[in-house]
Swiss-Prot record:
Cofactor descriptive note: Binds 1 [4Fe-4S] cluster per dimer.
Modified residue annotations for ADP-ribosylarginine: R97
Keywords: 4Fe-4S, ADP-ribosylation, ATP-binding, Iron, Iron-sulfur, Metal-binding, Nitrogen fixation, Nucleotide-binding, Oxidoreductase
Oligomeric and partner information: Homodimer.
InterPro entries: NifH/chlL_CS, NifH/frxC, Nitrogenase_Fe_NifH, P-loop_NTPase
Entry binding sites for ATP: G8, K9, G10, G11, I12, G13, K14, S15
The protein, known as: Nitrogenase iron protein
Class of the enzyme per the UniProt entry, highest EC level: oxidoreductase
Role played: The key enzymatic reactions in nitrogen fixation are catalyzed by the nitrogenase complex, which has 2 components: the iron protein and the molybdenum-iron protein.
Species the sequence originates in: Desulforamulus reducens (strain ATCC BAA-1160 / DSM 100696 / MI-1) (Desulfotomaculum reducens)
Length: 272
């Protein structure tokens, strides 16, 4: 069972990328569980065709400790198992704690079955605070992929996340598997992301081009592979899934200093 955490700044398309990749892996016959670790609880919506799944934290609040696995785990596209951690009530408590609570509950309820090929954690990634680092800190997820684009803030966030991965790699055995570019059609984006990944000592695992088909599928509450499997964009996610499935390059990243990151951005025309 490979346990993978997907990080990236808010709004970068992390949940969309994760679900489309999971759909491609499921199409290829893989058994997968997706654990949403974002208070927005939108990490499984496309796999569940828009079903607004009740989160682990909401279920705990409503039902108390007496919970069955089927109360929090729903089956989605390609027999994927879908769980949403959820978050605390706004202004009260720490969302990171919710992730810790959820993963512990899933373990105690026997969600991590031996037939699973993959567990994906879709994690809010602007902040690598203790709770959001839970999937990597506790040694659950061994592989990290960071979703980024050629935009400055996406790369700042990706570099910061790399610092968190580096910190836990030395103690926990977690490794960076690569950078996923979710394109924003920025000038020189492919070259910049390739150079950025190389600078970290990693690789660009795939460049996902921007395509309105992704939004069209989302409006229909589906992944692209589910909505229109013959689309070229569906093949992009299949390629990404294959690259992750066959990946053997796992590194302790070497995050950049602020100055070096800005040099890189300037060299590729992102900063003046």
């Amino acid at each position: 069972m490979r346990q993978i955490a997907i990080y990236g700044k808010g709004g970068i398309g992390k949940s969309t990328t994760t679900q489309n990749t999971v759909a491609a892996l499921a199409e290829a016959g893989k058994k997968i569980m997706v654990v949403g670790c974002d208070p927005k609880a939108d990490s499984t919506r496309l796999l569940l065709h828009g079903l607004n799944q009740k989160t682990v934290l909401d279920t705990l609040r409503d039902e108390g400790e007496d919970i069955d696995l089927e109360d929090v785990l729903k089956t989605g596209y390609g027999d994927t198992k879908c769980v949403e951690s959820g978050g605390p009530e706004p202004g009260v408590g720490c969302a990171g704690r919710g992730i810790i609570t959820s993963i512990n509950l899933l373990e105690s309820l026997g969600a991590y079955t031996n037939d699973l090929d993959y567990v994906f954690y879709d994690v809010l990634g602007d902040v690598v605070c203790g709770g959001f680092a839970m999937p990597i800190r506790e040694g659950k997820a061994r592989e990290i992929y960071i979703v980024a684009s050629g935009e400055m803030m996406a790369l700042y966030a990706a570099n910061n996340i790399s610092k968190g991965v580096q910190k836990f790699a030395n103690t926990g055995g977690v490794r960076l598997g690569g950078i996923i570019c979710n394109s924003r059609k920025v000038d020189n984006e492919l070259e910049l992301l390739t150079a950025f990944a190389k600078e970290l000592g990693s690789q660009l695992i795939h460049f996902v081009p921007r395509d309105n088909m992704v939004q069209r599928a989302e409006i229909n509450k589906k992944t692209v592979i589910d909505f229109d499997p013959a689309q070229p964009q569906a093949d992009e996610y299949r390629t990404l899934a294959q690259n992750i499935d066959g990946n053997d390059m796992f590194v302790i990243p070497k995050p950049m200093t602020q100055d070096r990151l800005e040099e890189l951005l300037m060299a590729h025309g992102i900063l003046d």
